[in-house]
């Protein structure tokens, strides 16, 4: 099965984990990713297997993810993931294949509201997912969303199962630092207000 993306005159195939073919151009891949640039620089054996008469590489990502990823390589309307979980998976793929410019573009689109982002009620799960994918930017953004929400066993429930390694410790530490900074800001604001009032009385 081939992707529905219309990419004319391809010379390479990305094959998804569910065996969907994504025709692409080697120069586009090489410019977007040092990983693929190195991969494509390797000599192709004369007896190498071909797909539709083209060299290919089998990837571990599924067709839904590659559909979005490939659409971001070309000047065509992007295929936007349907959930923040899928956006995180897309960011993780960019990280895996060293597609820094594509990853930055996706994050900019999240900021604009074009791509889905986790809601406050999804913050703890989003943090756990971002942690499992080593997405530090998304971890910090999700951690920020958890502020003001109780972090108790009763509140977290099944979300605790999603946390790995020292993710819980890191989140507790982040919340403590953020709370301290917030308290300092409030204290500074009160001090500034008192000085302003005192200055007004002297005048």
Report each predicted region and the residues it spans.
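Terminal end segments
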Residues: 180-203
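C-terminal end of P-loop GTPase domains and the immediately downstream helical coupling element
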Residues: 173-175, 186
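Post-BTB helical module
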Residues: 68, 72-161, 165
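BTB/POZ (also called T1 in voltage-gated K+ channels) oligomerization domain detector
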Residues: 1-81, 202-203
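C-terminal alpha-helical interaction modules of replication/initiation AAA+ assemblies
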Residues: 164, 178-180
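Residue-level detector of functionally special positions within alpha-helical transmembrane segments
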Residues: 25, 98, 134, 200-203
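Aromatic/basic-lined ligand-recognition segments
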Residues: 169-171
């Amino acid at each position: 099965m081939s992707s529905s993306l219309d990419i004319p005159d391809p010379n390479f195939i990305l094959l998804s984990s569910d065996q969907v073919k994504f025709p692409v151009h080697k120069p586009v891949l090489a410019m977007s990713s040092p990983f693929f640039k190195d991969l494509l620089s390797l000599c192709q054996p004369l007896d190498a297997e071909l797909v539709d008469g083209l060299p290919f590489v089998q990837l571990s990502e599924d067709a839904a993810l590659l559909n979005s990823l490939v659409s971001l390589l070309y000047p065509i309307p992007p295929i936007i993931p349907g959930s923040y979980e899928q956006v995180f998976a897309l960011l993780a793929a960019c990280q895996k294949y060293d597609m820094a410019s594509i990853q930055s573009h996706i994050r900019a689109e999240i900021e604009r509201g074009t791509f889905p982002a986790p809601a406050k009620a999804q913050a703890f799960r989003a943090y756990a997912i971002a942690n499992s994918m080593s997405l530090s930017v998304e971890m910090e953004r999700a951690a920020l969303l958890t502020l003001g929400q109780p972090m108790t066993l009763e509140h977290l429930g099944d979300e605790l199962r999603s946390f790995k390694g020292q993710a819980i410790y890191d989140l507790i530490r982040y919340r403590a630092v953020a709370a301290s900074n917030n308290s300092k800001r409030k204290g500074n604001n009160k001090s500034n207000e008192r000085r302003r009032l005192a200055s007004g009385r002297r005048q």
